[in-house]
Amino acid sequence: MSNTSWFNKDEFKKNIISNCKSLFRKNIDEADKQQLFQSVAYAVKEIIIDRWIATQKEYAKQDKKTVYYMSMEFLMGRALGNNMINLMAYDEMKEVLEELGMDINVIEDQEPDAALGNGGLGRLAACFLDSLATLEYPAYGCGIRYKYGMFKQEIKDGYQVEVPDNWLKDGNPFEIKRSEYPTVVKFGGYVRSYRDEKTGRDMFVQEDYRAVTAIPYDVPVVGYGVNTVNTLRIWDAEPVDTFNLSSFDKGDYQKAVEEENLAKNIVEVLYPNDNHYAGKELRLKQQYFFVSASVQRAIAQYKERHDDVRKLYEKVTFQLNDTHPTVAVAELMRILMDEEGLEWDEAWDVTTKTVAYTNHTIMAEALEKWPIELFSRLLPRIYQIVEEINRRFVEEIKAKYPGNQDKIRKMAIIYDGQVKMANLAICAGYSVNGVAKLHTEILEKQELKDFYEMMPEKFNNKTNGITQRRFLLHANPLLAAWITDKIGDGWITDLTQLKKLKVYVDDAKCQQELMQIKYKNKVRLAKYIKEHNGIDVDPNSIFDVQVKRLHEYKRQLLNILHVMYLYNEVKKNPDMDIKPRTFIFGAKAAAGYKIAKQTIKLINSVADVINNDASINGKIKVVFIENYRVSNGEIIFAAADVSEQISTASKEASGTGNMKFMLNGAMTLGTMDGANVEIVQEVGIENAVIFGLSSDEVIRYENEGGYDPMEIFNNDQDIREVLMELINGKYSPDDTERFRDIYNSLLNNQGDRRADTYFILKDFRSYADAQKIINERYSDEKAWAKSMMLNIASAGKFSSDRTIEEYVHDIWKLEKVHIPDVK
């Protein structure tokens, strides 16, 4: 499967042994598991380093355009196994470890997931980096080196408890600190302007500011089967003066450590709770911190080889992954004008050819806005620039739509006391893309309609994708080997080749083999559940899985309400013909998101009742997997029978979990939302189960009204029974009010928020019927196996390789740079 003629087994073994000595002063047989992991990781890194150096040299030599992919999150997962696979030396390295008495799985389990992201946004960025390196395109990922990530989730008494995710406590063996590139980032103070006598230009200087030093840490991104090693550059913050000794000596201890704390706070956690002012301020600081450092460094790199910054766009493109890095627009303008001496029009010309924006959400609340007071106080010069961009943009709007105040209200960057980041990104970006066909259509016709009418040429769609190297080759070795046995290993770098499996869909032997692989993966997950949850689950039951961020629009609540309904049905009809079903949830709720956290408690309370009811003979089990992340996700995707993708239609931009499940042979149970629409197009409606309102219907109800959940409550006895159980103590005997907020959210208008905002009761019956169809289909093993195989065979479109090639062709205009073999 791999050409590893370059791999020197003896040298690799020798390196592991010597690493163990030099890092820990121990022989292999004395080291603990973490020390063994570190010793192996450094030995793998040594192999990567030569390619990494060669990559940077070749990039410098060929001087081709580079994309800087800016993202608040990079959900990388574990690096060791992935690097071994992409070096095409997994089996050989595994053999060396066995000779040294190590089990590769135990060693891999010692590595914490890199806590640099939370949800799909960050995982997409990680998949994109994998594809960019594999496809040999020059690229940097730019982000923050969070000390604690978002949080590690623990479940105590059924409640989510957030504890710090101290993923760096043993160090990250794959990163390299680049102290030689310190970059100063300034906050606060005021802007002094003066006229330059020589040039007659107005000059602007930020004074009385507080500063931190951004220090980059570089993490290698290894391409599969190529010599390319790209870089994820994550920034740490250090005080400009490490320690203010004179203040300390004068007894002003507070001031002495102030600078230290300013720096420390910036990189502490991902998405600090912004329910309060200090949290909002910290988020904006984080965004400007990593964007300013990344843009400054990119321009410095450009200037090492080029004199004319007016041609920056020929060599550099900044891709903004969602609105978080949008301040890059104004920061680039600031550098070009204040430091490089360009006039406004020249700087604007460069900026609008260099920056491109990906929109990831239809939810208006997630399109970031900052109070003017906060923005202008924290980033005074940046605010001046945004003000001027806004003034000119509003003039353009007025010229195009005279007297249309409504257009200005919707499109202005600064309006109603707020700075609107999405509007800034669209105004300045040369490309604006959505992440699935339906999502892009909704942006163009609904959410961003005014922008689309004014500048349609900017808008385009790039349907998301996932890397098959992690989510099939690494996550599901049994299935990967089976596919390679049937069609060869070309699918690893060209996922469309999976369609060759279609000739086997009616082959009884292949169907059986596939069911056997799924069964073994379910046994692996059942073992994980027993170990972590203490619950026995039956691998012969249907594994029905919903793992994703916890948000009301993703409707974990619909899922658990249906479980409550199904439980009632089984209790009433003990002889009911139902395939045993294991409902598996995994989700983190944002720390300040009250109803999401109550939903987790509800799921766990329902699990406690159902899992301990012997009278139903194990027909239903409910499992909540603690601290869902990439590494346990890999075990889950491989084992799922049913993929729950049940967001309210029109709300999920794309989703990528749906693709990971499909690639591993799960049946999609979902609404026509996000990329589900395209999955159904690829696999055929008969190989998925679709339910619920369409996005058009949802949007119509939202705009015109006409939906009253109380009507359903009054007329549907089963739904009423389930909702009453939220408040009659069935699942909370010690506190009947515990789930009152959930009950109220479904039935009562609250302020300007409509009852059942996400149409859970409206879609409930349709969902329950869809679940019955799943039950029937699973009873026909041959038909189910055929559907499984068709799902795998139809997943070719959903590789991030395809997505990246589209970005390259339509937006970035990059050229491949082939890295020759390292001698």
Report each predicted region and the residues it spans.
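A conserved ligand/cofactor-binding region detector
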Residues: 1-823
